[in-house]
Curated annotation (Swiss-Prot):
Keywords: Aminoacyl-tRNA synthetase, ATP-binding, Cytoplasm, Ligase, Nucleotide-binding, Protein biosynthesis, RNA-binding. It is found in: Cytoplasm. The lineage of its organism: Bacteria, Pseudomonadati, Thermodesulfobacteriota, Desulfovibrionia, Desulfovibrionales. Residues 340-396 form the S4 RNA-binding domain. Its EC number is 6.1.1.1. This is Tyrosine--tRNA ligase. It comes from Oleidesulfovibrio alaskensis (strain ATCC BAA-1058 / DSM 17464 / G20).
Amino acid sequence: MDMDQQLKTILRGSAEFIDEEELKKKLAKGRPLRVKAGFDPTAPDLHLGHTVLIHKLRHFQELGHTVIFLIGDFTGMIGDPSGRSETRPPLTREQVLQNAETYKKQVFKILDPEKTEVRFNSEWMDKFGAADFIRLASRYTVARMLERDDFEKRYRSNMTISIHEFLYPLVQGYDSVALEADVELGGTDQKFNLLVGRHLQSQEGQEPQCVLTVPILEGLDGVKKMSKSLGNYVGIDEPPADMFGKLMSVSDELMWRYYELITTKTLDEIAELQRRVASGELHPKTAKEELAEHITAQYHGSDKAAEARQGFNAVFAQGCVPDDMPEFSCSCGEDSTPPAFLADSGLAGSRGEAKRLIKQGALSLDGEKLDDPNTPLTAGEYVVRLGKKRFLRLIVR
């Protein structure tokens, strides 16, 4: 593949790239680039929003470059302050390592494990002593740190900034020195940290890494970023039917962004789909089904994805209730109030999310809308439907 084609693939769906001329010089050397992306395992599972970065790593992998999936087990215990209005509570080593194992299993649904270098930044950071940290801290000034947007806002609002939070971008930057990275990838909220890596590499006599940022993926609502706490996410490990159904709820406009950022479709294939929809040759719903099946197949295989599509059409196009809905039992009383059984069964992410959905009229029992979140259900068996795509067989004892 010639350089122009490589650049087109590399820049696909990117938000910003620093610096394109430097990248051309690196590519001209004809050796595989060392491409790094770091992930702090602060939660036990990944959702599709995280995979924007992983898909970009895959693009580099397909071009023959060395991909480094860096697990920030050391930085995870500090807590990334990026985009935070308050100090993030640090995790224990045990929590971080447990989450890291889950991450590895999930990312290899996208990346080729044979072509991926998995590293932990504790490999070099655990060897750092007090003198090493003081030397590292001397490489950056407080004034430069306060140029970072989230730090500046907190400083001007007289909100607490802990010293350890200043260390986070320095440690992340030093990771690039330790790995001799040619390129580092990150979300747009990581730009400051990525540039610190360039600065530290220059000071260590290394060729500064290029920086590529990817956009933050909007959640199912199309407004806010995908987040488990907001309930607008699709988890990588969700059952095929749930994943397919959630993806069918995105808007027609957001569908194309998902195609570009979190599928393996080529830009030419996506452009052809857009042309067919615009000409009326292909219905937008069919294009969305193709998207949902493609993404579901990435994580569950083509057979399960096809079954999910077939099941979706049986339930929603024909108004059927699925035969294989999950079953959940609870006791009469507090446990049988709608927010409780929705959250405890996993149908809703939390009791707060359940209450919001009930107020929006999203809950029905045996086909009847239910808008009272406070009254416990009496003993019996119910078919629960939450929104368009979530079903539950509820047994109250």
